[in-house]
């Protein structure tokens, strides 16, 4: 039962109030951020509780990931301030009141929490306004990232005197680049956490394969695998996609009864108690046996997935991995009679995007789409790599050169989306590389996606998650039938 409406939701105890890693980790991260910037104040607001339907009944609290990275605290209502001129770091927030303690039990003071992450100075949340106003009056610049929550926009607007709808235009590109440069290269302790999340995701997908059979609902499987995520951490890392209609890329409707002959697509991941994420996708037959047509298409997607692991490593451009996966898919579809002509030319104009209208993947870490709130132009692209306007490539979240320590996903797929197929045929799209008469035979096929998580290493890459969920057609069939 939530506390009554008079109880401040922002004071409620969270699952992980203590620091995530040791204090030296956070001291070193903040020091590294100081070193990348000069002059002014860096404002890093944490998240507040977000009401579901009343102030006392909130959604599960999720701290802002950049605040977590530099301050490591999972308490609502906190903000961090880095003074780039003096080198001082300050944590702003409020101590629990007696009313809070009655409802949540004893909680550490703000000063105690600050000590766990190596911050020597704390001040009340109300004092942050005075600190910002004093800095602005002296003409000092305030560096901040674009806020993505309504509550944070409102707070930032009040603190900075900038209209909420204009905050993004005042956000600091210099700070964005600095934060991305630090967060995108994962530390060993972070990789261990991501491995835990991947191990949990593997359990989720294996359970789904064992449960899957005609006659049960998608919801039954969704509930079971999300329970596994909660048993082993903080729950799912994003709303699970559990569907026998894989042609809908982000399908969150769980009401269908599973039918023999359909393919089940599950895109689901876990989040650890320390908020590190995983993201796997598997596609398998509802009745435990692939048809010949399903196997043919599945093996093309698996070959594209395998090709990305052959390529990935330091200095490889991610857009090249996408293009190579696209070539494998195009050549495979040509072998089935769905595409025709020179496939290099076809991929050059994006004809394969009819079947894979999304990019190959994304970075992953404290966010499942890591740092996406900061902006893809910083996370996925840079001065060296600009986004393409070609179909397929235009949807690629990341194209830039990979570095050792990156954690990325690879998720090629083939989908037969009736509305998209009709549009392309009606408008004469595809450059003559699509055999629409043959494609129409697949309108009831659905979709297939295979997604794994990988770490970029000095020598190339390695798959994360230990015991990889079954991925070959033979392995899936054996596992689903008790093997």
Protein language model regions, located:
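Active-site neighborhoods and metal-handling regions in enzymes and metal-associated proteins
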Residues: 3-483
């Amino acid at each position: 039962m939530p506390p009554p409406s008079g109880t401040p939701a922002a004071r409620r105890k969270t699952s992980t109030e203590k620091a995530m890693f040791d204090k030296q980790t956070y001291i070193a991260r903040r020091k590294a951020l100081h070193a990348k910037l000069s002059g002014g104040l860096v404002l890093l607001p944490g998240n507040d509780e977000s009401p579901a339907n009343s102030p006392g009944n909130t959604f599960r609290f999720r701290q802002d990931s950049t605040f977590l990275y530099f301050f490591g605290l999972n308490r609502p209502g906190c903000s961090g301030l880095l003074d780039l001129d003096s080198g001082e770091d300050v944590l702003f927030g409020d101590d629990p009141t007696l009313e809070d303690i009655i409802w949540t039990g004893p909680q550490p003071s703000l000063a105690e929490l600050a000590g766990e992450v190596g911050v020597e100075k704390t001040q009340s949340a109300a004092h942050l306004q005075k600190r910002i106003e004093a800095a602005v009056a002296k003409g000092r610049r305030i560096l901040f990232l674009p806020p993505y929550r309504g509550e944070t926009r409102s707070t930032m607007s009040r603190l900075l005197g900038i209209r909420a709808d204009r905050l993004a235009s005042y956000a600091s590109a210099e700070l964005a680049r600095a934060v991305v440069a630090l967060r995108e290269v994962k530390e060993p302790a972070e990789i261990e956490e991501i491995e835990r999340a991947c191990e949990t995701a593997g359990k989720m997908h294996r359970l789904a394969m064992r449960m899957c059979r005609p006659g049960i609902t998608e919801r039954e499987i969704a509930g079971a695998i999300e329970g596994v995520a909660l048993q082993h951490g903080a729950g799912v890392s994003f709303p699970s996609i559990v569907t026998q209609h894989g042609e809908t890329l982000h399908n969150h409707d769980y009401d269908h009864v599973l039918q023999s002959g359909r393919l089940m697509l599950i895109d689901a991941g876990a989040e650890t108690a320390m908020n590190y994420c995983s993201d796997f996708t598997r596609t398998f037959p509802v009745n435990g046996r692939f048809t010949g047509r399903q196997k043919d298409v599945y093996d093309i997607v698996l070959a594209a997935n395998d090709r990305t692991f052959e390529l990935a490593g330091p200095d490889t451009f991610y857009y090249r991995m996408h293009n190579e996966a696209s070539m494998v898919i195009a050549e495979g579809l040509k072998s089935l009679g769905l595409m025709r002509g020179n496939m290099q030319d076809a991929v050059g104009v994006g004809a394969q995007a009819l079947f894979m209208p999304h990019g190959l993947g994304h970075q992953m870490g404290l966010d499942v789409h890591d740092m996406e709130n900061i902006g893809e132009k910083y996370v996925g692209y840079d001065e060296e790599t600009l986004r393409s306007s070609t179909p397929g490539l235009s949807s690629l979240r990341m194209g830039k050169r990979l570095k050792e320590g990156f954690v990325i996903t690879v998720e090629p797929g083939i989908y037969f989306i009736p509305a998209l197929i009709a549009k392309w045929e009606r408008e004469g799209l595809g450059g003559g590389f699509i055999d629409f008469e043959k494609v129409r035979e697949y309108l009831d096929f659905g979709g297939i996606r295979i997604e794994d998580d990988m770490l970029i290493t000095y020598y190339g890459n390695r798959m994360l998650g230990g015991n990889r969920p079954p991925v070959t057609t033979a392995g899936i069939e054996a596992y689903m039938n008790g093997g």
